[in-house]
Amino acid sequence: MASLRKTHPLLKIVNDALIDLPAPSNISAWWNFGSLLGLCLVTQILTGLFLAMHYTSDVATAFSSVAHICRDVNYGWLIRNIHANGASFFFICLYLHIGRGLYYGSYLYKETWNIGVVLFLLVMMTAFVGYVLPWGQMSFWGATVITNLLSAVPYVGDTLVQWIWGGFSVDNATLTRFFAFHFLFPFIIVALTVLHFFFLHETGSNNPTGINSDADKVPFHPYFSYKDLFGLVLLLLALSSLSFFSPNLLGDPDNFIPANPLVTPPHIKPEWYFLFAYAILRSIPNKLGGVLALLASILILMLVPILHTSKQRGLMFRPLTQLLFWILVADVMILTWIGGMPVEHPFIAVGQIASVLYFTLFLILIPTTGWLENKILEWN
């Protein structure tokens, strides 16, 4: 008689996705980040749920309700620290996951990749509205600056901004709706994650060589279930270490000052995981141009499958494109650094050069090098 997990309508789905799933035998630790992102998402939803039980989305009490959570609620400080730092780990895993996809050509699974880009945008939106909720100085001014960018939209810009604000400035209506969005978006992310998963399992996983691996598959359990478990332990170890020993390392000190519309902080900057996009936004001296560049910096990922020119899938056997990939990684790091710096010489020039290089790599250099490598292969 067949096992229950193979016959039960619900368990069969779990079995086909997590137990008897045929996986390439040679996928490396870079393939762990999908499950780590799942862990981050579950952690964020659970800690967020407990925070929402004590938080009040009102300008008069939001800041003090967060202080109350940290001081008076049982383990409230821990829940808040894990939620705040969990967001950073979410983005670390996200960037590594995207980097893996770019390096090994996983973007050629177009549906999976495009849903992934939409997920990336949604996670960014969720993190942005979440950062506004403690109603500190950086929360308020970050919300003001970023929502104000929508005023650059021709004709409807000003109306759009006031519609999002729910008034003539960032105020109580804005905070309340941002809390509603912050609660809603993670569940949309869960739904899209299921779709992401579904499309991935239509094709099966890619592998480091980029070669079809149908001839060499192993069951997901026990091989990759234990491998993923090891990744989960490392992630939880790193997250708990940061949350216990240095919970405010990645935060902004200005956010410990209650929001004051009359006093602007000396440097308005978002959390570290948005700095590369913020640097691209600031590198263009025109408002609409900056907004378009900001959008393009993320949406350019959707063009990657179209711009793939190489006959090989991944970069494992393509040293020239490998070099460009690592230049791209360094460029994103430089943009992240510039995004956190004041707008003055020499940071302006460095930011502009790095922004131009970012788009040039994606649109010109990497596709051209792929074509060149094809030619070199033909010569042999």
UniProtKB/Swiss-Prot annotation:
Binding site for a ubiquinone: 201
SS bond partners: none
Membrane-spanning parts: 33-53, 77-98, 113-133, 178-198, 226-246, 288-308, 320-340, 347-367
Pfam annotation, one family: Cytochrome_B
Binding site for heme b b566: 97, 196
GO MF annotations in UniProt: metal ion binding; ubiquinol-cytochrome-c reductase activity
Chain residues that bind heme b b562: 83, 182
Main localization category: mitochondrion
Note: Heme 1 (or BL or b562) is low-potential and absorbs at about 562 nm, and heme 2 (or BH or b566) is high-potential and absorbs at about 566 nm.
Protein name: Cytochrome b
Species of provenance: Zenopsis nebulosa (Mirror dory)
Gene name per UniProt: mt-cyb
